[in-house]
Structures are given as structure tokens and as C-alpha cells.
Amino acid sequence: MLIVRSRLFDVLFGIWTLLQSPFIPALALLQRPGLTRAAIRFWTGGVLGLSHRILGLRLQEEGIENKHLEAPCIYVCNHQSTWETLAFNQLVPDICIVAKQELRKIPVFGWFLGHAPMILIDRSGGGRAMAAMISEARREVARGRSILIFPEGTRGHA
């Protein structure tokens, strides 16, 4: 049964993504960052809804009393899967995700990343890349956006 549910999710995820895929690049090309972020949140909400209904995955937020949405902050997270990246798009209204530049090489997905409101870093750049990331993060926080960073980088097991 798990295989059937997984395949059903894969098919519906593909259909949902195809239905949404014209909107995000169009808004990005029109340079409408607010609407682009709203479209991304709509898409991630649909993906999380499918994963809940079909796979039984639930998003449970703990410590909400410590969440202060009136001011931007930095979220530091251990990267377990793609799921938490999607979840943060729902939990935090205006989040800027720090991601590795190599993801831009993935066909189609890379184009979306390049036009999404994200901070892309070259991990081979050492201190120069760190300085650029900090500079961009400061700029985004000044704009009122929170930052999500996975300091371990690629998925960790901690």
C-alpha cells in the first residue's frame, strides 16, 4: 500500500507542479517578487496538502509562542529533506532561503531557483562566499524578510 500511495503522490505532485509552473516564472520575469513569493507559497501549500492527505505527513509547529512575525529573524535548521524547505515557506510568510549555487545546474528547477527570492552561494568560494552571503542576508533582513539557513549544508543526520 505504501508503494501505491507513493506513486499516487508522485503523479499528483507532477500534475500540481505542471499546473502551477507557468505562474511562478511569469511573475518572476515581470519582476513581481511579492506575487512570486505568494505563488511559491501557494504551490508549497498544495505539495504539503498532498503529502498530508496521501502520505500522512503532518506539519506540526511547536514553540509558536516564541515565534515573532513582526520582525525578521534568522532560522537555523538541520537539513533532513526537501520537506522542511517547503514547510518553512508555509510557516514564515516572507522567508529568504540560503541555498547552494550548484542547485542552479538542475534543469528547469535551477531556472526557478535563479528567479526565486533566495540567496544562492558558491560553497567553493570560502570566506568570499561567506561575506557575500552575509551581505545579501543583511540586505534581505533590512527589507523585512527572515532568513532560513542550513549551516550543515547538504542533508545532515544529526
Feature locations, PLM:
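A transmembrane-helix-recognition feature enriched in membrane-embedded lipid enzymes
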Residues: 1-60, 111-112, 116
